[in-house]
């Protein structure tokens, strides 16, 4: 079996999921024309980051002939499965309020259950885990490292922007005051 072909197939599947997320998000924004979108200038960089998540590992694996390492793949796959489980839980919890854009919810739509009972931004934790682990399925460590660093820069700004927007809602401020951003009790 050609592990590179399987890896490229996984990247293709992730690309389709990302495209579906953008389509769903646009439809939700059209359904709420009054919605406040808080970070229009940052969004193109996020799109570029996620395009890079598909393109860079593929180029690294093919161009630099990264070998398939079963132990590394197994560890990366375990992280990816955990991240996917957290994503499903997060999206089921937040429901129709989820969007790829920073959209201020209605004041009565603040979510405090599911993973939001422990951290403010479970979906960003998912993205951190995905960006770190997806390239490592086939040893693309340069992609994992460089994309993780870029993601840290993007998320540091995006989280501040999102929290500034959500802090306009007293219910969000009160509910999230004692919760860490990404890791319960730590960060």
Residue ranges: model-predicted function:
Residues 1-5, 32, 59-67:
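Short, hydrophobic transmembrane alpha-helix segments
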Residues 23-41, 68-187:
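Cytosolic-biased juxtamembrane loops and peripheral soluble domains of multi-pass membrane proteins
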Residues 7-10, 175:
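Anionic, Ser/Thr-rich low-complexity intrinsically disordered regions
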Residues 41-74:
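Long, highly hydrophobic alpha-helical transmembrane signal-anchor segments
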Residues 11-26:
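N-terminal signal-anchor/start-transfer transmembrane helix
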Residues 4-7, 46, 73-79:
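Alpha-helical transmembrane segments of integral membrane proteins
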Residues 13-16, 52-53, 57, 78, ...:
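Hydrophobic alpha-helical transmembrane segments of multipass integral membrane proteins
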């Amino acid at each position: 079996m050609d592990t590179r072909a399987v890896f490229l197939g996984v990247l293709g599947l992730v690309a389709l999921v990302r495209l579906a997320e953008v389509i769903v998000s646009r439809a939700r924004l059209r359904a709420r024309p009054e919605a406040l979108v808080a970070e229009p200038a940052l969004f193109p960089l996020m799109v570029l980051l996620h395009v890079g998540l598909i393109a860079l590992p593929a180029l690294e694996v093919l161009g630099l002939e990264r070998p398939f390492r079963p132990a590394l793949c197994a560890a990366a796959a375990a992280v990816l499965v955990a991240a996917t489980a957290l994503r499903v839980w997060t999206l089921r919890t937040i429901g129709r309020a989820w969007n790829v854009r920073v959209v201020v919810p209605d004041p009565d739509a603040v979510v405090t259950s599911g993973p939001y009972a422990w951290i403010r931004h479970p979906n960003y934790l998912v993205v951190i885990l995905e960006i770190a682990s997806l390239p490592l399925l086939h040893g693309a460590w340069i992609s994992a490292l460089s994309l993780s660093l870029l993601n840290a820069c993007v998320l540091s700004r995006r989280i501040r922007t999102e929290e500034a927007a959500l802090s306009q809602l007293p219910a969000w401020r009160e509910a999230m005051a004692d919760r860490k951003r990404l890791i319960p009790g730590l960060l």
